[in-house]
């Protein structure tokens, strides 16, 4: 009979439980309270598990860091846990980066970016230790977003420059640039490049390093900028590769000529511009490079291969 009363208490609406529970024998009241506490504990564990799963899917952070973040925020808020996790990821990434300083990082990507109006173009090299990590879509997206962020930042800084080439060898300054999406230059992903690289190191356990970067600016209307990268599946992204080139031409009459010339530089790897002009085109062996250029002149060019940064 007592258990029937207990069943009716458990199944009753919450507002009636306190009244009905008084009719239970004392032993059954204790059992009811234990059941209630157990269900609350299960509910809390369930919500924490859901939070851990969601954070893992969104950040790909190590599970032990996610659990720490959830525990420190009592598993109550996704956004609070994510904020704590972000700080933990940065700290772990910086510690790992120090530990991994001596490790060789020659894999990764040469990445290019160009403004929609072709007023400026950027090329950078982002390195990691293994091809496995380089093939991670998050690392590929980091390279693309970094190139776009550097391009827009340096183009604004050098907007009044009369120099055709703007080379930044101060990588520490570049790492202070705020990262934005390569798909939306007005976006703000909330991290500097340094923070983003630290997070990537924390996630992958590998050294993630910006090795070099360069920006070309078109300072005269008759100049044309071009870019080309080679060495990856086009389904990954046409702006990523093992080899890349930026080119600046003057008096270019044909649209897209600078891109074509950049492709030739990548294929030929000439030692000098004189050698290049007298070479036969890789893509049209009936013409020399001088023929392809026509009235255009090569003002500047840079060709990089992955893993060869000094």
UniProtKB/Swiss-Prot annotation:
**Keyword check for Protein biosynthesis:** yes
Cysteine disulfide partners in this protein: none
* Record GO biological process: mitochondrial translational elongation
- Organism domain of life: Eukaryota
InterPro entries referenced in this protein's UniProt entry, alphabetically: EF-Ts_dimer_sf, Transl_elong_EFTs/EF1B, Transl_elong_EFTs/EF1B_dimer
- List where in the cell it is found: Mitochondrion
Q: Which GO terms describe its cellular component?
A: mitochondrion
Q: Where does this protein chiefly localize? A: mitochondrion
**GO MF term (any one):** translation elongation factor activity
Member of which family? Answer: Belongs to the EF-Ts family.
**Any idea what job this protein has?**
Associates with the EF-Tu.GDP complex and induces the exchange of GDP to GTP. It remains bound to the aminoacyl-tRNA.EF-Tu.GTP complex up to the GTP hydrolysis stage on the ribosome.
This one is known as: Elongation factor Ts, mitochondrial
